[in-house]
């Protein structure tokens, strides 16, 4: 089958990465369709809907490239699958990662299903990751060539079935080259700045946004031995290892969040970047997903490396099944400020094996007060 007989539906955001993705596929001769996903009603404080601006950029890019385009609304799916999860996690005192859930439930589920209904053979996005297709048909996901932009951390929940239908055309090139291609082609998005932060918050103040949905409950900020250091403005506004926004003055080392007590509405703080309470030996994680589950013996356990947050260096770990629903991930050396609700993502070299959601964090067999 020649490329012209292969239909690829590209998820287009109005940014430079997805614009170049569509251009590259068109140049390679594929039958390309651009689709803009509207996942959130994101009118800003001035009454301007940024999604409209982004869609206008998609229209212009698609016209420049010479491909058809559509818009599809996934606001209900996004609310049900991503935003509800986001709020529930904050209610539990955890720090969620909505990008991971958005990829799992929207971009590579709702959008993938929609694309297949349009007769697509594959979907493509502007993610910095790579797909390796083996002769027997199974696939592996590899880190993007641009280490600084690699996005496999956020794609850790994707299954073999999902990835077999996915292309990441810019995963083999660096961001600077993506910009160069966009400028060379005269694409209107060539100099558009990258979006940052959580898509549904955008440029809004995080505290203000969250308080619209969850009532803040101020409480005491104390040390682990009970010394009161001040007031917090609501546990949901703080994450493990956080330094800024505590409002604790005085001399000596800066103060950091080392735990939360939901029952008593207490925020635990301690002084010093390397305070002992910030370090742990192992974690328990649930909702785990592996691209090739049969390659990993969870009963015997296996060694690999892991990331506990985006752009963090890999850490050597040992992964083993804890029970039917959870994994135990033991670190080769203590790790600082691991955060419940975030993803732990596993690697063998450049291959992303999969990931899980961090539930509890332990030191010397004792559970830390990260979220209790």
Swiss-Prot record:
Task: Give a yes or no for keyword RNA-binding in this entry.
Answer: yes
Annotated segments matching region Interaction with tRNA: 149-151, 309-310
**Location in the cell:** Cytoplasm
Q: Does the keyword Nucleotide-binding apply?
A: yes
- Annotated binding of ATP, by residue: 11-18, 37, 126
Query: Which Pfam families does the record associate with it?
Result: tRNA_Me_trans, tRNA_Me_trans_C, tRNA_Me_trans_M
Q: GO MF terms on file?
A: ATP binding; tRNA binding; tRNA-uridine 2-sulfurtransferase activity
InterPro entries the UniProt entry points to: MnmA-like, MnmA-like_C, MnmA-like_central, MnmA-like_central_sf, Rossmann-like_a/b/a_fold
Q: Where is this region: Interaction with target base in tRNA?
A: 97-99
Q: Which reaction does it catalyse?
A: S-sulfanyl-L-cysteinyl-[protein] + uridine(34) in tRNA + AH2 + ATP = 2-thiouridine(34) in tRNA + L-cysteinyl-[protein] + A + AMP + diphosphate + H(+)
Site for Interaction with tRNA, residues? 127, 342
Q: Which NCBIfam families match?
A: PRK00143.1, trmU
Q: What does this protein do?
A: Catalyzes the 2-thiolation of uridine at the wobble position (U34) of tRNA, leading to the formation of s(2)U34.
* Protein family per UniProt: Belongs to the MnmA/TRMU family.
Tell me the protein's name: tRNA-specific 2-thiouridylase MnmA
């Amino acid at each position: 089958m020649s490329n012209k007989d292969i239909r690829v539906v590209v998820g287009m955001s109005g940014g430079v990465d997805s614009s170049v993705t569509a251009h590259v596929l068109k140049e390679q001769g594929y039958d390309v369709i651009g689709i803009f996903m509207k996942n959130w009603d994101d009118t800003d404080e001035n009454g301007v809907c940024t999604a409209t601006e982004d869609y206008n950029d998609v229209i212009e890019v698609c016209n420049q490239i010479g491909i058809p385009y559509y818009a599809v609304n996934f606001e209900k799916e996004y609310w049900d699958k991503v935003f509800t999860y986001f709020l529930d996690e904050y209610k539990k005192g955890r720090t969620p990662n909505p990008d991971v859930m958005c990829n799992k439930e929207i971009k590579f589920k709702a959008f993938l299903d929609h694309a297949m209904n349009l007769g697509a053979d594959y979907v493509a996005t502007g993610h910095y990751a790579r797909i390796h297709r083996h002769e027997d048909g199974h696939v592996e996901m590899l880190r993007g060539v641009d280490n600084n932009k690699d996005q496999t951390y956020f794609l850790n929940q994707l299954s073999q079935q999902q990835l077999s239908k996915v292309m990441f055309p810019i995963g083999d090139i660096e961001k600077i080259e993506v910009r160069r291609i966009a400028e060379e082609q005269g694409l209107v998005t060539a100099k558009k700045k990258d979006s940052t932060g959580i898509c549904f918050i955008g440029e809004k103040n995080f505290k203000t946004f969250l308080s619209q949905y969850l009532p803040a409950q101020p409480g005491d900020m104390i040390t682990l031995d009970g010394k009161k250091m001040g007031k917090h403005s609501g546990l949901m506004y703080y994450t493990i290892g956080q330094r800024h926004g505590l409002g604790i003055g005085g001399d000596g080392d800066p103060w950091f969040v080392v735990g939360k007590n939901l029952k008593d509405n207490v925020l635990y703080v301690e002084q010093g970047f390397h305070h002992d309470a910030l370090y742990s030996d192992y974690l328990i994680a649930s909702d785990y997903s592996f691209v090739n589950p049969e390659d990993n013996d969870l009963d015997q356990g296996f060694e690999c490396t892991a990331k506990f947050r985006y752009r963090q260096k890999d850490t050597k770990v040992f992964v083993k099944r804890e029970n039917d629903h959870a994994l135990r991930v033991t670190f080769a050396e203590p790790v600082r400020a691991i955060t419940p609700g975030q993803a732990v993502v596993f690697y063998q070299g450049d291959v992303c094996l999969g990931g899980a959601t961090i539930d509890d964090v332990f030191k010397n067999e004792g559970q830390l007060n990260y979220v209790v």
